[in-house]
Amino acid sequence: MSSPLSASRVALITYSGVPAITTDDRLLRDALVARGAAVDARPWDARTDWSSYHRIVLRSCWNFHHRPKEFLLWVNEVKENHDGTLRNSPELVQWSVDKRYLMDLDAGGIAIVPTIWVSAVEGDVVPNLDALIAAQGWKEGAVVKPAISATAHQTWRVAPDLASEHQARFESLLASSPSGVMVQPFLPEIRDGEWSLIFLGGEFSHAVVKRPADGDFRVQNDFGGTVERREPEPSLIEDARAVLRAAARATDTRVEDILYARVDGIVRDGALLLMELEVIEPMLFFSHAPGAAARMAELIVSR
């Protein structure tokens, strides 16, 4: 198939700590090469002549949450000097760096995990974590995480009867998190698995269920989590599609222009309860879905 941008150059964005692309993204690279593109892995935080690339596609830039200001400056630099090349779009990326984007989705009618947002304001009294959890009646305890985070970094569970033991850690996290901290109820449904529904070009592609290791709640592979391909019910796909539509409205973006998105959540009472919308650097589980990498490659070179 001849593509409009055949013989183009594509940068798959990584970071300086791990500059090579992931094993999963090699499938995307190979599919791009098969369509005539020259493909390079390039860390966002390394000197690069970005003007030489037709497409700059964010992939494993997994340190952005450690350096959010620098990352956003880089995104803005690409937007101003190489307009139209970054995927996902700068507007979508800038909006989603801070998990307070969930407020916009909540306002847009999306069912999200109940969240208490705590910000560190000089002179304010830091809330008592024990009292905060008790006031919500969260009998399973809570999960605490920074508003800017990834891969469960600085994320932990607080048992309801041990919250006072976590106060110092909570205060330390709050002091080191300019964007604030999220406190959410622990969801027992996570033991049954967290759904990840992947969309490419605004269309549903495939889904997996991630399960935590025994005794943990984090589903990431780093913590012993497992992944399996699953076919979701049509209603679950529609719930996830509604998340994309709400994100598109919030960022003045067309749904079909969202190159890739991963909608993460649990199922409660037969409906999706959103945990996160990943549009920056999600694992897309190409190895679990034959043909998905080829579909994304075609979108990259044809739009």
Which residue stretches match the model-derived regions?
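Phosphate-binding site of ATP-dependent enzymes
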Residues: 153, 159-250, 266, 273
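Conserved N-proximal alpha/beta basic substrate-recognition cap immediately N-terminal to
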Residues: 9, 15-123
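ATP-dependent carboxylate activation and anion-phosphoryl transfer catalytic cores
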Residues: 217, 234-303
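Anionic group-transfer/hydrolysis microenvironments
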Residues: 61, 147, 186-187, 198, ...
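ATP-grasp fold ATP-binding core
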Residues: 105-106, 113, 133-154, 178-190, ...
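Short amphipathic alpha-helix with an adjacent loop that forms part of the alpha/beta core around
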Residues: 45-52, 126-136, 172
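Conserved hydrophobic helix-helix packing surfaces used for dimerization/oligomerization
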Residues: 10-11, 155
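Short acidic/polar capping segments at secondary-structure boundaries
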Residues: 91-92, 119-123, 147-151, 161-163, ...
